């Protein structure tokens, strides 16, 4: 190797020096022929003039590492380019595929259509009379979108409102009936805009589905509550008899302890259980022993141990009254609860009732609004639907009356100090504010709704027109009443002046002219009241 390059030539064996001169000349001739043949490249077969050219050819052509690295990098870059181009094409195809699909349920058809094709299958079922006509250079109906409706952006009719939207603003789906109304049970999946999607019934409900378990709870609770109530009444009667017994009978402490007179009197009211029958305490389930002696409850007569008995001191009783834990739970704790409740301020209970009525008003107001919106949705009005709306409105107004009555009870309740009066006044003011806001927000039922007909926008415009006429007529009547009241005021002043001047003949004339004015005012007031009811 020379200058860092590998030299290729014919290797001459070392044993040539041992040969004779004849053999040396012969081998030299053969070696010269081998050297000539060695100028051919062993890799690519290229013939070169000499060994130096062969070495240069090998170094430049076949052993250049930098060129191999560049070729390898070029091949890697070309592979990455081909892969990225293929992925981009695949992404574009997937996007086009997804763009033509709807991310919602289909109608269960067996045609195999998906996306817009499946949505178009319902076009023959749902009415299209309300669709917006197509004109050139239309833009999306969404107020925040200014896309031009074309083949790329799309031009999709909302099946509910009929307006035209782009693909992005019509990617919603709801169930509609054949009349393009909301029908979540028997409707068909149709493509709609966002406003119609969010405007469907129940979308803005925050409570969700409610299943009341009160009836089941009441079924299980009522027997237990009735049993406890009957037990409380029975124990209260026995307690009352015991108190009357000790107040009517003159029993001294000596008679009670030595002559067992108290025991006989108590047994005359409550039958005591036989000691020999009971071997285990019913309260703690322990056997009776010398240290765990038997005792009798004075209210129920059961046999209990001395560790499960409670001693209740009574004013008229010469010795403590022995009762069991069950009687203490059923009677004395109820008495204590009722006593503590009776000590609380009276208007506090009214405030609690106010909260209950308020919650009920919120629930019935929501139910009334839902039923009224369903009634005015454009569907055929049935007698049952109209009755439900009227009943809910009536129930809501009854709750408002109860709410107002409870509020007046709080206001009229006597106060012991200024702080209590200020607290009551704040509660009443808040209740008044809430009641006024609720009544003002209450939507009235249109008076000319008829069973068997549908509520339309024309009916609404007609109602507004009639309402304006009623308001105009009412304003005219009020102006007339004001004029008549001014005349009455002037006539009354004239009567007072005539009385002061003792002109009694003029007084009679003025009084006779005053009566028709009052009758006319009363008649106009009734007409205004009738118009108010008509407006409601």
Swiss-Prot record:
Positions with a binding annotation for Zn(2+) 3: 297, 300, 324, 327
Biased amino acid composition, Polar residues: 12-31
Record keywords, A-Z: Metal-binding, Repeat, Zinc, Zinc-finger
One of the Pfam families matching this protein, by short name: FYVE
Residues that coordinate or bind Zn(2+) 2: 281, 284, 305, 308
GO CC annotations, alphabetized: cytoplasm; cytoplasmic side of endosome membrane; Golgi apparatus
Gene Ontology MF: a single term: zinc ion binding
Residues of the signal peptide: none
Record keyword Repeat present: yes
UniProt binding sites for Zn(2+) 1: 158, 161, 193, 196
Positions annotated as zinc finger (FYVE-type): 136-201, 275-332
Segments forming C2H2-type zinc fingers: 39-62
Region ranges (Disordered): 1-31
Keyword Nucleotide-binding part of the UniProt annotation: no
GO BP: Golgi to vacuole transport; vesicle docking involved in exocytosis; vesicle fusion
Function noted in UniProt: Required for vacuole segregation and vacuole protein sorting. Possibly part of a complex which tethers the vacuole membrane to microtubules, either directly or via kinesin or dynein-like motor proteins. Probably functions in several interorganelle traffic pathways.
Protein name: Vacuolar segregation protein pep7
Provenance organism: Schizosaccharomyces pombe (strain 972 / ATCC 24843) (Fission yeast)
